[in-house]
């Protein structure tokens, strides 16, 4: 059962909540909506669910225009941030409510509810009322209630937002497998990029009510359409900028800026083996762009390598699953942060901060270039 949203727009007064948003969700796939608060993600879910009407555009479910069709006929379940549990019903009664309405037998209801209670790790609260539950428990009860009726479509708004740690990772993996096994087409809103990458077949990025890019997580990570999508899908390492005016005539430069440029070209030689990129880096047009790499595209080693750039260790931060190295390339004042696994870190055999490391690009590098915009780096996202 596929979902097609075609040029949907929605305004609240003078505020444009959604601006001609289009997306397609293939049958039995999971699409994650990413974007900052206020980008229109939850509003889009409400329109797809039939809880709100668009000012313009249409919503198609499995090839049928359902834009003006009531929610109850859309064969759709949803879990929003306000869990809407029945306060006077126990956890068991909340989860079984939809099954009882559909006339399932007592034994089938019991088996289904108990299975979901076990999988979502809430068997211990089966007789409790919502008023006594934590936010994370309420979330899981609401999710279990939606999954119990096995709809064709499922809409999730931050389904694990109140959870963290190992439980959240476990439930994310379980839910992805459950949705595939039961043939449910799903759209999920999340602020957790790692969760979106691990769960979703495709990711959609929204900003200020506008569609920016849709694709597989690897495509968005490797080749984001702009800086915003790039930084939203993972960490960037920016190439340093030359100290030279953007308004300077082509070919004109001071002796100091010329020496800086030569130093920069020398430092970046390993990164620009391609002829086209070489021309960009030696051309005035470099001043009009920001250039970025992903941290994983860089390789660190402790042995002297004439084809690599020497770097100074500034700081070592030990995280739960990786080590963060803050490094500096002195001639060009290029400060970079590289996360590496503990096994790779041990191989570097770092003895002191005085020790130099050597960095170079891996075999395949996507050198991303985006036009400069005022305050593009410092802008809060």
Curated annotation (Swiss-Prot):
Its main location: plastid. The keyword Disulfide bond does not apply. It is an enzyme of class 7 (translocase). It is found in: Plastid, Chloroplast. It comes from the Eukaryota. It catalyses: sulfate(out) + ATP + H2O = sulfate(in) + ADP + phosphate + H(+); thiosulfate(out) + ATP + H2O = thiosulfate(in) + ADP + phosphate + H(+). InterPro entries: AAA+_ATPase, ABC_SmlMolc_Importer, ABC_transporter-like_ATP-bd, ABC_transporter-like_CS, P-loop_NTPase. GO terms for molecular function: ABC-type sulfate transporter activity; ABC-type thiosulfate transporter activity; ATP binding; ATP hydrolysis activity. ATP binds at residues 35-42. The keyword Hydrolase does not apply. Keywords: ATP-binding, Chloroplast, Nucleotide-binding, Plastid, Sulfate transport, Translocase, Transport. Pfam families: ABC_tran. Residues 3-233 form the ABC transporter domain. SMART domains: AAA. SUPFAM superfamilies: P-loop containing nucleoside triphosphate hydrolases. GO terms for cellular component: chloroplast. Part of the ABC transporter complex involved in sulfate/thiosulfate import. Responsible for energy coupling to the transport system. Belongs to the ABC transporter superfamily. Sulfate/tungstate importer (TC 3.A.1.6) family. PANTHER family: SPERMIDINE/PUTRESCINE IMPORT ATP-BINDING PROTEIN POTA, SPERMIDINE_PUTRESCINE IMPORT ATP-BINDING PROTEIN POTA. This is Sulfate/thiosulfate import ATP-binding protein CysA. The gene is cysA.
């Amino acid at each position: 059962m596929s979902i097609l949203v075609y040029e949907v727009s929605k305004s609240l007064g003078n505020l444009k909540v959604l601006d001609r948003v289009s997306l397609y969700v293939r049958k039995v796939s999971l699409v994650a909506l990413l974007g900052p608060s206020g980008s229109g993600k939850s509003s889009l879910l409400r329109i797809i669910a039939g809880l709100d009407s668009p000012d313009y555009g249409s919503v198609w479910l499995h090839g049928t225009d359902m834009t003006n069709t009531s929610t109850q006929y859309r064969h759709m379940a949803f879990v929003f941030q306000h869990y809407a549990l029945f306060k006077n019903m126990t956890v068991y009664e909340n989860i079984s409510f939809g099954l009882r309405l559909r006339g399932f037998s007592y034994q089938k209801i019991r088996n289904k509810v108990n299975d979901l209670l076990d999988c979502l790790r809430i068997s211990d609260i089966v007789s409790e009322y919502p008023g006594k539950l934590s936010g994370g428990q309420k979330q899981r009860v609401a999710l279990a209630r939606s999954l119990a009726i096995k709809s064709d479509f499922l809409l999730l708004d931050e389904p694990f937002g109140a959870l963290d740690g190992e439980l959240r990772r476990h439930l994310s993996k379980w839910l992805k497998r459950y949705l595939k096994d039961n043939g449910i087409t799903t759209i999920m809103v999340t602020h957790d990029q790692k969760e979106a990458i691990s769960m979703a077949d495709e990711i959609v990025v929204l900003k200020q009510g506008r569609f920016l890019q849709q694709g597989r997580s690897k495509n968005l990570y490797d080749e984001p359409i702009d800086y915003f999508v790039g930084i939203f899908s993972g960490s960037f390492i920016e190439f340093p900028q030359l100290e030279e005016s953007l308004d300077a005539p082509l070919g004109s430069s001071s002796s100091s800026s010329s020496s800086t440029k030569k130093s920069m070209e020398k430092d970046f030689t390993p990164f620009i083996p391609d002829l086209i990129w070489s021309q960009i880096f030696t051309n005035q047009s470099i001043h009009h762009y920001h250039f970025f790499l992903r941290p994983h595209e860089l390789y660190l080693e402790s042995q002297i390598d004439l084809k690599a750039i020497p770097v100074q260790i500034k700081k070592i931060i030990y995280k739960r699953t990786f080590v963060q190295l803050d490094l500096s390339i002195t001639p060009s004042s290029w400060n970079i942060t590289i996360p590496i696994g503990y096994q790779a870190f041990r191989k570097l055999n770092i003895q002191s901060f005085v020790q130099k490391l050597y960095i170079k690009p891996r075999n395949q590098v996507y050198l991303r270039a985006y036009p400069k915009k005022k305050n593009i780096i410092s802008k809060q996202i």
